[in-house]
Amino acid sequence: MTLRAGVLAVQGDVSEHGDAIERAAAAHDRTAEVVEIREAGLVPDCDVLLLPGGESTTISRLIHREGIAEEIESHVEAGKPVLATCAGLIVSATDAQDDRVDTLNVIDVSVERNAFGRQRDSFEAPLDVTGLNESFPAVFIRAPVIDYVGEDVEVLATWDDRPVAVRDGPVVGTSFHPELTEDPRIHDLAFFDSVES
């Protein structure tokens, strides 16, 4: 069975995300058809969505202008899986602590943009993630910090005593970039019922 995976592509190169989704699907003996979402009308036909990193104010502006935001919200309301990474997490939050970001309100968290530092402060760290048997090599680049978690949100991983991966219903959000590793387990966690390590 082919998994139709939408990757929000309104800003920047998203090829790593497509590769990561294909690796995750292959781990489950499935294939993935990756659809780059740049305009309205494509999200309703997707089984899963990936909201990638980038610049959150730009992403927010473009998805609302293009009519994609409402489709993402409907996707979540239908219980379909979403993985939101870095800026995708910011845009998905209930509070981005920045009036320039019109959030989707699909993850009940408050996030602070770039709180782990600027580009030069990027780092990789092994994370213990709920549901994974071994640590995950998380890559943090201008990463946001989650500083409030709603009562129905499950914290999946922390770094320096701060949440960096969460699940709110069908949506998994990460402060880090799982697509920058060869390890598909975060995508497994977000998109499939079982996780293989």
Curated annotation (Swiss-Prot):
Pathway note: Cofactor biosynthesis; pyridoxal 5'-phosphate biosynthesis
GO biological process entries: glutamine catabolic process; pyridoxal phosphate biosynthetic process; pyridoxine metabolic process
Catalytic activity: aldehydo-D-ribose 5-phosphate + D-glyceraldehyde 3-phosphate + L-glutamine = pyridoxal 5'-phosphate + L-glutamate + phosphate + 3 H2O + H(+); L-glutamine + H2O = L-glutamate + NH4(+)
Catalytic residues, chain numbering: 86, 177, 179
Ligand binding (L-glutamine): 54-56, 113, 141-142
Example of a GO MF term: glutaminase activity
EC identifiers of the protein: 4.3.3.6, 3.5.1.2
HAMAP family in alphabetical order: PdxT
Assembly information from the UniProt record: In the presence of PdxS, forms a dodecamer of heterodimers. Only shows activity in the heterodimer.
Protein function: Catalyzes the hydrolysis of glutamine to glutamate and ammonia as part of the biosynthesis of pyridoxal 5'-phosphate. The resulting ammonia molecule is channeled to the active site of PdxS.
Family the UniProt entry places it in: Belongs to the glutaminase PdxT/SNO family.
Protein name as it appears in the record: Pyridoxal 5'-phosphate synthase subunit PdxT
